[in-house]
């Protein structure tokens, strides 16, 4: 599946948000790339909407075509389209692995899933965009538990808060999906209504 593989820090600086998570280069230079950063200009409504969509896409590592499909699905569901969209993005397996603290970044989580390190309800899943459901159980494969990424995850457990809709159990690093998240449980610097306004034109 296609995905953005360019320089993440440069993209973070352009969009004004740390897309990597703990990106020290971004923290040192949180202004747009260029010799002195882009001059401050009054942003048009369209530009703000487009930038918010790009922030969401690159935060979750989703290409435009797939992101559009997510929006269309969210728009068909009952409730607020923006809330539905974020819930869909959060329910991706790579994001769940990241949120559970088993990977430092979503990009790393995507790699771990693609390399076949996880079972969902006892079945191997190696598709990062796989959508989890309430009451799913996600396990690290037995032979993967002692590999370096999961050793590091155990050593650094607790450094990043785990959202209340997930639970990580014991040394086996089993992930329990208690529910799909409500908007208040999603800690992401996005104004999703701007994305809805962009696509609804």
Swiss-Prot record:
One of the primary rRNA binding proteins, it binds directly to 16S rRNA where it nucleates assembly of the body of the 30S subunit. It comes from Mycolicibacterium smegmatis (strain ATCC 700084 / mc(2)155) (Mycobacterium smegmatis). Belongs to the universal ribosomal protein uS4 family. SMART domains: Ribosomal_S4, S4. Residues 91-157 form the S4 RNA-binding domain. This is Small ribosomal subunit protein uS4. NCBIfam families: PRK05327.1, rpsD_bact. GO terms for cellular component: small ribosomal subunit.
